[in-house]
Regions:
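Class I SAM-dependent methyltransferase SAM/SAH-binding core
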Residues: 101-103, 107-155
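Conserved class I S-adenosyl-L-methionine
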Residues: 41-93, 109, 113
Length: 247
């Protein structure tokens, strides 16, 4: 009988950890030039894919390495995103129990940060990786307020017009067909809903390309922010897209 898959607690090997840190440093360094030089942007994407393959983020032991080593690095960013989510809903006079969907939630850190600020919200995190959601499952609540689902971002098990806010961080550059994901976001959003999509600018397509894809899917890009100062140094490599559902 196969042993049930579970997050490993064994530390990463020293040499492997050093190589991973070098790859991350190289990606961030290239980010300074990526916005200006298109070949550098392509090289950075290739390096990021190499990092994903090296870490094996979507299977064990890579998921455990990500949850224990990489996810905490983005803690300050997640807190800033959670504040954005709360502010966005408050500015729209949202009901007390909004439904929030986190696409590509990984080990669930952002879901937890949002739940601390919106105590009555219903928050669902989805991810294509079962091993990532083994980590996220630690945060599941018995009342169903927080739960996680294994599924593709382009095939979300939600009814039409049932979600108040969609959020995604560090996931868009993994989408093989962004148009399909944006179409799914447009489908599940309520007519007055909003999506906040964050990704590393050096890994994603140009802002104009993404805006065009979103518009074709039935979403209206209302704001594009290249820097998020309150998220710390790392956040300066991010782009945030605010997309609204069409009434």
């Amino acid at each position: 009988m196969k042993e049930r898959l579970r997050p490993t607690t064994e530390p990463s090997r020293g040499g492997r950890g050093k190589r991973l840190r070098r790859l991350v440093s190289a990606i961030l360094l290239l980010g300074v030039l990526a916005a200006l030089v298109r070949p550098v942007r392509r090289a950075t994407r290739a390096l990021a894919r190499r990092l994903d393959a090296r870490v094996e983020c979507f299977t064990e032991p890579g998921s455990s390495t990500y949850a224990r080593v990489f996810a905490p690095v983005f803690g300050r960013l997640y807190r800033g995103v959670a504040e954005d989510v709360a502010s966005e809903l408050a500015s729209r006079g949202r009901k007390r129990q909004p439904t929030i969907l986190d696409l590509g939630c990984g080990p669930g850190d952002l879901v937890v940060e949002i739940s601390h600020r919106l105590r009555e919200a219903r928050i669902v995190g989805i991810d294509v990786s079962p091993s990532m959601l083994l980590w996220a499952g630690r945060h599941t609540t018995t009342d169903g307020r927080i739960r996680f689902i294994v599924c593709d971002a382009a095939e979300v098990p939600f009814d039409d017009a049932s979600v108040d806010l969609v959020v995604s961080t560090l996931s868009m550059h993994h989408w093989t067909e962004p148009a399909d994901v944006f179409a799914e976001i447009a489908r599940v959003l309520r007519p007055d809903g909003v999506a906040l999509i964050y990704d590393l600018g050096l890994l994603s397509s140009t802002t104009s390309e993404i805006a065009s894809i979103a518009e074709a899917a039935g979403l209206e890009p209302t704001d594009i922010v290249r820097e998020r100062a309150r998220g710390g140094l790392i956040s300066r490599f991010f782009v945030r897209f605010t997309l609204e559902g069409l009434a």
